[in-house]
């Protein structure tokens, strides 16, 4: 028996069937319809985009339309003035304690040594030294002290010692 010719054609190279005009038009309409539907689905912003099926409650997706919960003033309101915290005032030192602090100030000592050595200070340093020396003078006047008291007392003691020596002999 001879094999049928129809079977041999189907197994071999099949000739591509040409599409009719109606089929081509239908495919073109389908392609156009698909092309129109590209992009985001309508209402995707309101729907939230991600639709994960999960248990409602804690894991519920948040609505992207809901923003910050801070209240926004709608009318003109008075300006709110913030009260500044008062700076912690330095504890009031007694004049004696303040004088001791100024006399033991390392920066003041260093600048005075530079002045004695003949160096010139910057305007800022000079004004700082002048202010500190003025404060020392004020404190010494309050306490009834002076620079010359120590020297005069030493001279007075020397004179008294001399007088005692002269009288004693």
Curated annotation (Swiss-Prot):
Any single biological process term in GO: ribosome biogenesis
One GO MF term: GTPase activator activity
InterPro entries documented for this protein: YihI
Listed Basic residues bias regions: 10-19, 31-40
Keyword check for Glycoprotein: no
Compositional bias (Polar residues): 49-58
Domain of life: Bacteria
Residue stretches of biased makeup (Basic and acidic residues): 20-30, 160-169
Start-end of Acidic residues biased regions: 147-159
Region (Disordered): 1-100, 144-169
Keywords: GTPase activation, Ribosome biogenesis
Pfam name, any one: YihI
Stated family: Belongs to the YihI family.
Subunit structure: Interacts with Der.
Function: A GTPase-activating protein (GAP) that modifies Der/EngA GTPase function. May play a role in ribosome biogenesis.
Protein name: Der GTPase-activating protein YihI
Gene that encodes the chain: yihI
């Amino acid at each position: 028996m001879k094999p049928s010719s129809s079977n041999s054609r189907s197994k071999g190279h099949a000739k591509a069937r040409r599409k009719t005009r109606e089929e081509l038009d239908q495919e073109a309409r389908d392609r156009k319809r698909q092309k129109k539907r590209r992009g985001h689905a309508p209402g995707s912003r309101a729907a939230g985009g991600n639709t994960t099926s999960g248990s409602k409650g804690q894991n519920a997706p948040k609505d992207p339309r809901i923003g910050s919960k801070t209240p926004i003033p709608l009318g003109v309101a008075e300006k709110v003035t913030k009260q500044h915290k008062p700076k912690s005032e330095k504890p009031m030192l007694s004049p004696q304690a303040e004088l001791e602090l100024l006399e033991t100030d390392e920066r003041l000592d260093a600048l005075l040594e530079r002045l004695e050595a003949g160096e010139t200070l910057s305007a800022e340093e000079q004004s700082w030294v002048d202010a500190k020396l003025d404060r020392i003078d004020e404190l010494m006047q309050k306490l009834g002290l002076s620079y010359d008291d120590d020297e005069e007392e030493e001279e007075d003691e020397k004179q008294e010692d001399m007088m005692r020596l002269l009288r004693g002999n």
